[in-house]
């Protein structure tokens, strides 16, 4: 397994092997960011008494992180786009290390919340960089696979990292869990400096204004698909527990385990297909999501149908972000990918917020049975845009 990296600021030759060590370092950065964001959600009963607040206010630690990431992605990316890329990446990782260390030792909820805001800002910066960084490390015909490797860190964090972190905190304490997460970020700094190549920032004369990047051919379509897919997905995923109970299946943990395991398979399949069959694979994934929502709406009361549908949902959704992200980098070009991805990060977080709100309104107004019917038209819009916008989602990679 080669770990060869290209020289600083140069594109690798087409025959060069994948820089596995560098790509895995970026994937671990994605893993660390997701685990930092979501770990408090599994630790509500443990953190609340130690910080002297309710469990709901511990939940706000996740909300605050997400809002900071949403707010910081575009302005921080615009501010830092002229700097060399690797120091910015290292700075974001050091921010994770410091903020998680503060959470580990803090006895003040206000200080903990402030540390979470800092972590969210670092997360917004990191997400804007990762896909473009991966794309610059490999030849054009391998971009999709490189991005899939990096974004696999998200899937592994959701499927394995958060449950494992929650279990670890139950054994060694939540403060130790955050301390270990801080240590992981420090180790990752060394890994990045050792194996991830450096790239220059944008020169002043080469910088394209944000509005022009947003208007590049294909970008609006990619952002639209991101928004509608995330809203539809979150309508169901946020309220999967009440929906499973509505369907007469009380084992929510099993439902989430099936979904998480299927996402790992989905991203592996995507890594194989993305560079050769981007558009057909994305159309198939979105069509499968739509069929799953229809099946959940019609026959979720049958346990076998519920679990099979959830597995197919995870299979389809697991690879969709990689496919969409690859299309975004193709549309923007690797040199402008950080700016384009900052836009997508904002849209992504907006989709999560709107989807959670929409699902909550549907649940309160019509009950859990309405959730798949609410999600279905949103996923269908994403499918329709992908089908029509052939320029944004080409059948084969450019």
Where are these regions (language model features)?
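Helix-to-loop junctions at the C-terminal end of transmembrane segments
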Residues: 72-85, 266-278, 363
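Intracellular juxtamembrane helix-capping segments at the cytosolic ends
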Residues: 126-138, 319-333
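C-terminal transmembrane helical hairpin of 12-TM major facilitator-type secondary transporters
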Residues: 280-324
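Conserved MFS/SLC helix-loop-helix module at the cytosolic interface between two early adjacent transmembrane helices
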Residues: 71-107
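Paired small-residue
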Residues: 95, 99-102, 110-119, 304-312
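Helix-breaking motifs and short loop linkers at transmembrane-helix boundaries and internal kinks
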Residues: 52, 84, 105-111, 299-301
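Cytoplasmic helix-loop-helix junction between adjacent transmembrane helices
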Residues: 109, 115-154
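C-terminal membrane-cytosol helix-exit motif in multi-pass small-molecule transporters
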Residues: 182-202, 385-389
């Amino acid at each position: 397994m080669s770990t060869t990296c290209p020289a600083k600021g140069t594109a690798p030759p087409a025959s060069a092997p994948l820089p596995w060590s560098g790509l895995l370092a970026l994937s671990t950065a994605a893993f660390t960011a997701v685990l930092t964001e979501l770990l408090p959600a599994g630790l509500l009963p443990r953190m609340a008494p130690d910080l002297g607040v309710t469990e709901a206010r511990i939940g706000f630690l996740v909300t605050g992180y997400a809002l900071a990431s949403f707010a910081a992605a575009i302005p921080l990316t615009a501010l830092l786009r002229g700097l060399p890329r690797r120091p910015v990446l290292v700075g974001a990782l050091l921010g994770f290390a410091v903020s998680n260390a503060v959470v580990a030792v803090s006895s003040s909820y206000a200080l903990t919340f402030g540390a979470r805001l800092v972590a969210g800002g670092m997360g917004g910066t990191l997400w804007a960089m990762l896909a473009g960084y991966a794309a610059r490390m490999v030849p054009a015909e391998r971009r999709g696979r490189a991005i899939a490797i990096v974004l696999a860190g998200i899937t592994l964090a959701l499927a394995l990292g958060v449950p494992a972190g929650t279990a670890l905190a139950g054994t060694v304490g939540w403060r130790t869990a955050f301390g270990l997460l801080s240590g992981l970020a420090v180790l990752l700094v060394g890994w990045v400096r050792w194996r991830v190549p450096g790239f220059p920032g944008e020169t002043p004369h080469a910088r394209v204004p944000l509005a022009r990047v947003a208007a590049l051919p294909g970008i609006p379509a990619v952002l639209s698909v991101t928004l509608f897919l995330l809203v539809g997905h979150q309508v169901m995923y946020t309220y999967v527990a009440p929906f499973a109970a509505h369907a007469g299946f009380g084992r929510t943990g099993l439902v989430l385990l099936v979904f998480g395991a299927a996402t790992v398979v989905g991203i592996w399949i995507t890594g194989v297909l993305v560079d050769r069959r981007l558009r057909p694979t994305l159309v198939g994934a979105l069509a499968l999501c739509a069929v799953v929502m229809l099946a959940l709406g019609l026959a979720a009361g049958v346990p076998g149908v519920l679990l099979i549908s959830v597995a197919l949902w995870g299979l389809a959704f697991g690879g969709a972000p990689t496919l969409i992200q690859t299309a975004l980098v193709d549309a923007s070009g690797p040199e402008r990918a950080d700016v384009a991805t900052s836009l997508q990060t904002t849209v992504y977080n907006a989709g999560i917020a709107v989807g959670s709100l929409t699902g909550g309104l549907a649940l309160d107004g019509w009950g859990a049975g309405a959730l798949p019917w609410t999600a279905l038209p949103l996923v269908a819009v994403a499918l329709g845009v992908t089908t029509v916008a052939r320029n944004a989602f080409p059948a084969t990679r450019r």
